[in-house]
Swiss-Prot record:
Cellular location(s): Membrane
Annotated protein name in UniProt: Uncharacterized protein alr4393
Top-rank taxon: Bacteria
Membrane topology: Single-pass membrane protein
Natural source organism: Nostoc sp. (strain PCC 7120 / SAG 25.82 / UTEX 2576)
Keyword Transcription (UniProt): no
Signal peptide: 1-19
Length: 496
């Protein structure tokens, strides 16, 4: 700042001195009536004044140019500086765009990684769902008792399928293990490539920051900036090539991983299916073998104890439920104990306070309920502990007296005793089916003498209609008493 003041003062003083000297010279030239270049004295004086003024201006500019290098470069190199500044700004803009593109690609890679984690969670959810379905399939095994006859004929096929399924399961397990190893290796490679790409991006960001700082310092380092920018441009180009190569490798790895994971999901699905089939076939085979050997003492869904309960006091309800569970335990002990053994004090049922409280909450409202204790699985003699489940249902009217349960037709003239007996058994089975669907677990009781009814049917000589009707009002607690009637031309001619 002091140098500027001195420079301005020197220019003012020097300009005044030169102007004064020029005026004196012009005055003396005018008085002396000198003539230059054959001009008149007056014109000569004017010319001398012009020359002194030009000298003042030239001296001023010379002092400014000599004293301030920036002013000298600004006057003579202004266009070059502006042109170079525009080029540097364009290069900075391109570098910022490249930086933005790299950040977008990095975000894209992060999104793909997040998608991979989401897919993994979906696979785990599907696996949990498959386990639930497996549990449901185990519960449906109660229906296998009705398929006993068909299972006996298919035993050879089941054993063959079992062995084949075991072989396929082992093969799938080996493939899955190999693919899991390959997937883990590819994931490790992907993480390495991502780390290298991230490192390259961070290095490029640092280079861009240095470049931005160099642009801001262009007034102080203008002479060396061009070379530094060229070096940085070369580094950026190299980094761009490296990033492009890394991105290409990552894309290829991602594609391979996606294919491997897809194949792994297929194999896992196939493995789950084969495991379910193997478990189902093993249970079928075990149930068939136990039935064949006569070992099953309790079957799934068998009623261990039942009672009709109506109370609204928690203590009384708890006492009744405990007594019912004790009765179920005694009945199970009788079924599972070996002949001649003492099983009176053996606790077979897994009874917990939580299950008792759950039953109390279900029936403790003052209404009448039917509570049944069922066997939760198939058990052989000698078992020391079994699972059970309880069922509660309102004890309501299910069938009114004289309500028709099932109907069939028969012609005693053309049917043998065995065929007639089969037709009646089918009628009774249909009645049992309706009773079970309505919630009555107790068996069907035939009201009257069944054999006498069959004998009288054999004596008829015309086609008849046979109906199974409820002998009395039947509630959920049961049992259902059935009366068989034979109808001919709309009239009841026989009845049990």
């Amino acid at each position: 700042m002091t140098t500027g003041y001195i420079l301005i003062a020197a220019i003012l003083i020097l300009g005044g001195v030169i102007a004064t000297v020029g005026d004196r010279i012009g005055t003396r030239v005018g008085k002396a009536r000198l003539s230059l270049f054959n001009l008149r004295p007056k014109n000569t004086a004017v010319l001398v004044t012009i020359l002194t003024g030009g000298l003042v201006s030239a001296t001023t500019l010379a002092i400014l140019f000599i004293a301030d290098e920036g002013l000298r470069k600004g006057v003579f190199e202004l266009e070059d500086i502006q042109k170079d500044l525009r080029q540097k700004r364009e290069q900075l803009k391109v570098a910022e765009e490249q930086k933005t593109q790299v950040e977008i690609e990095r975000n894209k890679v992060n999104q793909e990684l997040e998608t991979t984690r989401t897919d993994k969670k979906q696979v785990e959810t599907q696996r949990d769902q498959a386990k639930k379905e497996k549990l449901k399939a185990q519960q449906d095994l109660a229906q296998t008792q009705a398929q006993y006859q068909r299972t006996q004929s298919r035993l050879g096929q089941v054993v063959t399928q079992y062995q084949k399924a075991i072989a396929e399961l082992q093969s799938v397990y080996n493939q899955r293990k190999a693919l899991q190893g390959a997937v883990e290796q590819l994931k490790t490679e992907r993480r390495r490539l991502y780390a290298e790409a991230k490192k390259a991006i961070e290095q490029r960001d640092r280079e861009l920051a240095n470049r931005q700082q160099a642009i801001e310092q262009r007034d102080r380092e203008l002479a060396n900036r061009q070379q530094a920018l060229q070096q940085r441009d070369q580094k950026i180009s190299q980094l761009d090539k490296i990033i492009q190569n890394r991105n290409l490798e990552i894309a290829q790895r991602e594609e391979v991983i996606a294919k491997r994971e897809s194949r792994l999901k297929e194999l896992e699905t196939q493995q789950d299916y084969l495991e379910q089939e193997v478990a189902r076939l093993e249970k079928y085979y075990q149930s068939y073998r136990d039935l064949r050997l006569g070992k099953l003492a309790l079957v799934r869904g068998q009623v261990l104890a039942s009672a009709v309960i109506r109370t609204n006091q928690v203590a009384a309800t708890r006492q009744i439920i405990i007594q019912l569970l004790q009765e179920a335990n005694r009945n199970a002990s009788l079924e599972l104990s070996e002949p001649g053994s003492n099983s009176a004090n053996i606790e077979l049922l897994r009874i917990t306070p939580d299950r008792i409280e759950q039953l109390i909450q279900q029936i403790n409202d003052g209404r009448e309920y039917v509570v049944r204790i069922f066997s939760a699985g198939n058990y052989v003699r000698g078992e020391n502990q079994i699972e059970f489940f309880a069922d509660t249902a309102r004890n309501v009217l299910v069938f009114s007296g004289s309500e028709v349960l099932a109907t069939t037709t028969a012609d005693p003239r053309s049917m043998t005793s065995y065929q007639l007996r089969q037709r009646l058994d089918l009628l009774i089975s249909a009645s049992q089916f309706r009773a079970r669907n309505a919630g009555i677990v107790e068996g069907v009781q035939i009201d009257g003498t069944f054999l006498r009814f069959v004998s009288l049917l054999r004596q008829l000589d015309q086609p008849i209609e046979i109906k199974a009707i409820a002998a009395e009002d039947t509630y959920t607690a049961g049992p259902l008493r059935v009366r068989l009637v034979a109808i001919q031309n709309g009239k009841v001619i026989l009845s049990t």
